[in-house]
């Protein structure tokens, strides 16, 4: 619950089906619907990995439980026989580290307010004073946990997928669902909320029981799949714990684009520029995103930045994702081979069972992980690769880049493999086809831009990864000195 101008906005527990309507209705009642309140939506496309799922799929604002069927999805004589989905957790709280930085910035503004009484140069109440008085409701215990909005993300995704693929999510198949999750609570809670959404699909109108009481039982924790990066010694040594691996991130923080924002924000908030740094700017920007995503409200933190600032801050976030999870270092993506191979083992088994006229043992496999799970896998498959690497020095040249993490892995993002069996196939090869969906939209093949592939062709294209990429070898540290594989 958030207090704004004397009104209480009860948005944190409102059904997401009415998110937009409830928000604007509440704002109108509280006399807050001013032109400046549109800033939140104008900044929303630039929040990177803190982006709301509905900002990537705006149709969900009006119907979050109704599936949107991509016209490119196969139908007719081709029947889906298996679905393998990799799903990022839903909307979450900031981490404890982010909350501590926000508390530091908030304290800086409060100290500034006590010095000058919170008045601007004209004597009017200024933005710095408004931020000093804005309730700092984040607490350390929150530490990246799933919020109620995140549970809604998952329940509604379950309802949409069950409606889009009714044969796969049939009541008969419910007991054959396979759920795998990261050990992080936000992922475990996301998988539980997804199951509750399926219960709602099967038993409309009835409140779902605890997951432990469902016939299916709790999901299986498997960090070697969902958090493969934590189990890769080469990645941990050469990237995660390497002080120079994120050189371009640190260089951009002190570059002209970020320094211009730093000076502007210092002037706006009337604090010494030396008291601010790029990390504090980023936490202020993300606080705007958290308030919007978690509570559905636009806070004064959003007024600190304009769209040009947001684009620069988005690039800073994308630089980190690029060099730590994407194409920056080969090990980032190669460490995900084990997950990629696991997906194809499921598909292989389904093809084999169908060829033998046996029932598919696992028609639906749902795997709950992180943005850090999805980005390396998509990079391994060749998606969202720009001609030139993202660096600290080519921000303007990369304005139209493919690698934009907010469009790829927002909260509740999902990569789905759908295996089809086609009855009227002329050859055995044509019997099995595959489509991929990213965030519920058909994802063209990275190597051909076609929207569907014969399964055999897809497998052949990724033959090297499936046959030659051994995690134990990829993640083993070199015995002798070797050169960096920086792009």
UniProtKB/Swiss-Prot annotation:
<keyword id="KW-1003">Cell membrane</keyword>
<feature type="signal peptide">
    <location>
        <begin position="1"/>
        <end position="30"/>
    </location>
</feature>
<feature type="active site">
    <location>
        <position position="89"/>
    </location>
</feature>
<dbReference type="InterPro" id="IPR000560">
    <property type="entry name" value="His_Pase_clade-2"/>
</dbReference>
<keyword id="KW-0378">Hydrolase</keyword>
<feature type="short sequence motif" description="Prevents secretion from ER">
    <location>
        <begin position="484"/>
        <end position="487"/>
    </location>
</feature>
<keyword id="KW-0472">Membrane</keyword>
<dbReference type="InterPro" id="IPR029033">
    <property type="entry name" value="His_PPase_superfam"/>
</dbReference>
<dbReference type="GO" id="GO:0030352">
    <property type="term" value="F:inositol-1,4,5,6-tetrakisphosphate 6-phosphatase activity"/>
</dbReference>
<dbReference type="GO" id="GO:0005886">
    <property type="term" value="C:plasma membrane"/>
</dbReference>
<dbReference type="GO" id="GO:0005615">
    <property type="term" value="C:extracellular space"/>
</dbReference>
<dbReference type="GO" id="GO:0008707">
    <property type="term" value="F:4-phytase activity"/>
</dbReference>
<protein>
    <recommendedName>
        <fullName>Multiple inositol polyphosphate phosphatase 1</fullName>
        <ecNumber>3.1.3.62</ecNumber>
        <ecNumber>3.1.3.80</ecNumber>
    </recommendedName>
</protein>
<dbReference type="GO" id="GO:0030351">
    <property type="term" value="F:inositol-1,3,4,5,6-pentakisphosphate 3-phosphatase activity"/>
</dbReference>
<keyword id="KW-0256">Endoplasmic reticulum</keyword>
<dbReference type="Pfam" id="PF00328">
    <property type="entry name" value="His_Phos_2"/>
</dbReference>
<dbReference type="InterPro" id="IPR016274">
    <property type="entry name" value="Histidine_acid_Pase_euk"/>
</dbReference>
<dbReference type="GO" id="GO:0003993">
    <property type="term" value="F:acid phosphatase activity"/>
</dbReference>
<keyword id="KW-0325">Glycoprotein</keyword>
<feature type="glycosylation site" description="N-linked (GlcNAc...) asparagine">
    <location>
        <position position="481"/>
    </location>
</feature>
<dbReference type="GO" id="GO:0034417">
    <property type="term" value="F:bisphosphoglycerate 3-phosphatase activity"/>
</dbReference>
<comment type="similarity">
    <text>Belongs to the histidine acid phosphatase family. MINPP1 subfamily.</text>
</comment>
<dbReference type="GO" id="GO:0016312">
    <property type="term" value="F:inositol bisphosphate phosphatase activity"/>
</dbReference>
<feature type="glycosylation site" description="N-linked (GlcNAc...) asparagine">
    <location>
        <position position="242"/>
    </location>
</feature>
<dbReference type="GO" id="GO:0030003">
    <property type="term" value="P:intracellular monoatomic cation homeostasis"/>
</dbReference>
<dbReference type="GO" id="GO:0046030">
    <property type="term" value="F:inositol trisphosphate phosphatase activity"/>
</dbReference>
<dbReference type="GO" id="GO:0016158">
    <property type="term" value="F:3-phytase activity"/>
</dbReference>
<dbReference type="GO" id="GO:0005788">
    <property type="term" value="C:endoplasmic reticulum lumen"/>
</dbReference>
<dbReference type="GO" id="GO:0004446">
    <property type="term" value="F:inositol-hexakisphosphate phosphatase activity"/>
</dbReference>
<comment type="function">
    <text>Multiple inositol polyphosphate phosphatase that hydrolyzes 1D-myo-inositol 1,3,4,5,6-pentakisphosphate (InsP5[2OH]) and 1D-myo-inositol hexakisphosphate (InsP6) to a range of less phosphorylated inositol phosphates. This regulates the availability of these various small molecule second messengers and metal chelators which control many aspects of cell physiology. Has a weak in vitro activity towards 1D-myo-inositol 1,4,5-trisphosphate which is unlikely to be physiologically relevant.</text>
</comment>
<keyword id="KW-0732">Signal</keyword>
<keyword id="KW-0964">Secreted</keyword>
<dbReference type="GO" id="GO:0052827">
    <property type="term" value="F:inositol pentakisphosphate phosphatase activity"/>
</dbReference>
């Amino acid at each position: 619950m958030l207090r704004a101008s004397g009104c209480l906005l009860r948005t944190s527990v409102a059904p997401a089906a009415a998110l937009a309507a409830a928000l604007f209705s509440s704002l109108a009642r509280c006399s807050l619907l001013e032109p400046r309140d549109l800033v939140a939506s104008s900044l929303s496309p630039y929040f990177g990995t803190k982006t709301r799922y509905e900002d990537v799929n705006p149709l969900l604002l009006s119907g979050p439980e109704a599936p949107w069927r991509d016209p490119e999805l196969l139908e007719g004589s081709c029947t889906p026989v298996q679905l393998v989905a990799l799903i990022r957790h839903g909307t979450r709280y900031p981490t404890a580290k982010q909350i501590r930085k926000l508390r530091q910035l908030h304290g800086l503004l409060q100290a500034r307010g006590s010095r000058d009484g919170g008045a601007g140069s004209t004597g009017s109440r200024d933005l710095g004073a408004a931020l000093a008085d804005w309730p700092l409701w984040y607490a350390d215990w929150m530490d990246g946990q799933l919020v109620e909005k995140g549970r809604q993300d998952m329940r509604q995704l379950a309802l949409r997928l069950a409606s889009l693929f009714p044969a796969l999510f049939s009541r008969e198949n419910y007991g054959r669902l396979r759920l795998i999750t990261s050990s992080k609570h936000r992922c475990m809670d996301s998988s539980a909320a997804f199951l509750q959404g399926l219960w709602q699909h099967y038993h409309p109108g009835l409140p779902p029981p605890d997951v432990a009481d469902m016939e299916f039982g709790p999901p299986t924790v498997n960090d070697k799949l969902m958090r493969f990066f934590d189990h890769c010694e080469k990645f941990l040594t050469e990237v995660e714990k390497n002080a120079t691996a994120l050189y371009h991130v640190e260089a951009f923080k002190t570059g002209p684009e970020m320094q211009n924002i730093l000076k502007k924000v210092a002037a706006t908030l009337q604090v010494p520029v030396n008291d601010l740094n790029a990390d504090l700017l980023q936490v202020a920007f993300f606080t705007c995103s958290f308030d919007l995503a978690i509570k559905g409200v636009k806070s004064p933190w959003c007024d600190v930045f304009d769209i040009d600032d947001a684009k620069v801050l988005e690039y800073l976030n994308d630089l980190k994702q690029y060099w730590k999870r994407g194409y920056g270092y080969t090990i980032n993506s190669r460490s995900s081979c084990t997950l990629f191979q696991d997906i194809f083992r499921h598909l292989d088994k389904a093809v084999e069972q169908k060829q033998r006229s046996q029932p598919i043992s696992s028609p639906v496999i749902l795997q709950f992980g992180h943005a850090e799970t999805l980005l390396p896998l998509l990079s391994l498959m060749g998606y969202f690769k720009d001609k030139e690497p993202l660096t600290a020095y080519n921000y303007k040249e990369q304005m139209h880049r493919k690698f934009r993490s907010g469009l790829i892995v927002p909260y509740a993002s999902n990569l789905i493999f759908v295996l089809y069996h086609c009855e009227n196939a002329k050859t055995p090869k044509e019997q099995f086809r595959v489509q991929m969906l990213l965030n519920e939209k058909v994802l063209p093949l990275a190597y051909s831009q076609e929207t569907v592939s014969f399964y055999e062709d897809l497998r052949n294209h990724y033959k090297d990864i499936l046959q030659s990429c051994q995690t134990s070898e990829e993640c083993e540290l070199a015995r002798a000195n070797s050169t960096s594989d920086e792009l």
